[in-house]
From Swiss-Prot:
It catalyses: (2R)-2-phosphoglycerate = phosphoenolpyruvate + H2O. Its cofactor is Mg(2+). It comes from Sulfurimonas denitrificans (strain ATCC 33889 / DSM 1251) (Thiomicrospira denitrificans (strain ATCC 33889 / DSM 1251)). (2R)-2-phosphoglycerate binds at Q161, K335, R364, S365, K386. Its main location: cytoplasm. Catalyzes the reversible conversion of 2-phosphoglycerate (2-PG) into phosphoenolpyruvate (PEP). It is essential for the degradation of carbohydrates via glycolysis. GO terms for molecular function: magnesium ion binding; phosphopyruvate hydratase activity. Binds a second Mg(2+) ion via substrate during catalysis. This is Enolase. Keywords: Cytoplasm, Glycolysis, Lyase, Magnesium, Metal-binding, Secreted. Mg(2+) binds at D240, E283, D310. Its EC number is 4.2.1.11. The gene is eno. It holds the Pfam family Enolase_C.
Length: 421
């Protein structure tokens, strides 16, 4: 069995920007495709997303990345076995010749990497999660649902990028998703009753103008109660601050509250919020460059709150290893397009898990109908997944795939409240 053809075309993502769709065909006729996502708030150490520049699509075209797939990558992979993912990914890494896919583009390489894995699984007649994870792939991830959007994901006054609910008090994924959808709809009703805008942000959450960064939490608490659930027992709250986007004049600018704070003041603010509300997770609470601030945050909250590094670690095993040595954070967000290939993503997850760091599989704000990360989360036993609210098809595609997987995995395990015990 060998790879017979590799190709790519330019398609659209959920924000109306171009992205790369790759297709891999095997010698037995098996054909599979993948669509690459794209982020809005990105860490500066992420692998390079190759864009065309110029006036076409306001500089965001991806025809260069498409051509790299159709020419260089295709030539390098045709004839290779699809069943050795590490060799496939290493071949593309060597072909690129840089640390961050600065020549071929991570959007070209990742698309091919994903499509190869899909084609190999299909050829063997097994699900993708089983192909990548083997017999040990059995944990159905607990969702982190972004129901109020702010920051760079919305055109509103809220500084923090994501306000999420986590259905931790349920026994299976399907019931958790049901409860989350009910909270989401009750949240909409509350926002309407308060005359707030119920327009949606990039990830399907609501994007109202609110008076502070605490008010969204208060409204979510009301929505949980109105839906008939108990905050802290059945529904917990998670935040993605995306603090790198708030850096200003040596501090952090909170426009909605008309103040600039130091790292220590921001950490104290988080401590206060965690004392008042059932917050179990804070992502990117400090800037990717503020390692002293991260150290302080970890000392203050690391024993009781999940502290997730996204821009901080960018799914990079080398950077994560430095964080582990310095005792920074206790969890990592996993975004395959930050590092550029399936194999490198798996390497980072294994490093995190060996060192007691939790792993949260994640979408990007620019998504598609591709649900690869749903299978990937199960394959790697991540335990948690971020893929938006229960609205917008590119978000629900992942949830619907997880519902299918839960029905397939006979010995599947949904951790729920055990995540934070």
């Amino acid at each position: 069995m060998f790879i017979d053809n590799v190709s790519a075309i330019e398609v659209m993502d959920s924000r109306g920007n171009p992205t790369v769709k790759t297709t891999v065909e095997l010698s037995d006729g098996t054909k599979e495709s993948a669509i690459v996502p794209s982020g809005a708030s990105t860490g500066k150490r992420e692998a390079l997303e190759l864009r065309d520049g110029g006036s076409r699509y306001m500089g965001k075209g991806v025809l260069k990345a498409v051509e790299n797939v159709n020419a260089q990558i295709s030539d390098a992979l045709i004839g290779l076995s699809p069943f050795n993912q590490a060799v496939i990914d290493a071949t593309m890494k060597e072909l690129d010749g840089t640390d961050n896919y600065g020549n071929l583009g991570a959007n070209a390489v990742l698309g091919v990497s994903m499509a190869v894995a899909r084609a190999a699984a299909k050829s063997l007649g097994i699900p993708l999660y089983r192909y990548l994870g083997g017999a040990n792939a059995m944990v159905i991830p607990t969702p982190m649902l972004n129901i109020i959007n702010g920051g760079s994901h919305a055109d509103n006054s809220v500084d923090f990028q994501e306000y999420m609910i986590m259905p931790v008090g349920f026994e299976d994924f399907a019931t958790s998703l049901q409860a989350s959808a009910e909270v989401y709809h009750n949240l909409k009703a509350i926002l309407k009753s308060k005359k707030h805008n119920t327009a949606l942000g990039d990830e399907g959450g609501f994007a109202p103008d609110l008076s502070s960064n605490e008010e969204p939490i208060q409204i979510i608490m009301q929505a949980i109660e109105k839906a008939g659930y108990k905050a802290g027992e059945q529904m917990a709250i998670a935040l993605d601050v995306a603090a790198s986007e708030l850096v200003s004049d040596g501090g952090y600018r909170l426009d909605s509250e008309n103040r600039t704070v130091t790292s220590a003041e921001l950490v104290d603010y988080y401590v206060d919020l965690c004392n008042k509300y059932p917050i179990v997770s804070i992502e990117d609470g400090l800037s990717e460059d503020d390692w002293d601030g991260w150290k302080l945050l970890t000392e203050k909250l690391g024993d009781r709150v999940q502290l997730v590094g996204d821009d901080l670690f960018v799914t990079n095993a080398t950077i994560l290893n430095e964080g582990i040595k310095k005792g920074i954070a206790n969890s990592i967000l996993i975004k395959p397009n930050q590092i550029g290939s399936v194999s490198e993503t798996m390497q980072t997850v294994r490093l995190a898990q060996r060192n007691g760091y939790k792993c949260v599989m994640s979408h990007r704000s620019g998504e598609s109908e591709d649900a690869f990360i749903a299978d990937f989360a199960v394959a790697l036993n991540c335990g948690e997944i971020k893929t938006g609210s229960t609205a917008r098809g590119e978000r629900t595609a992942k949830y619907n795939r997880l519902l299918e997987i839960e029905n397939e995995v006979v010995y599947g395990e949904y951790l729920g409240s055990e995540l934070f015990n």
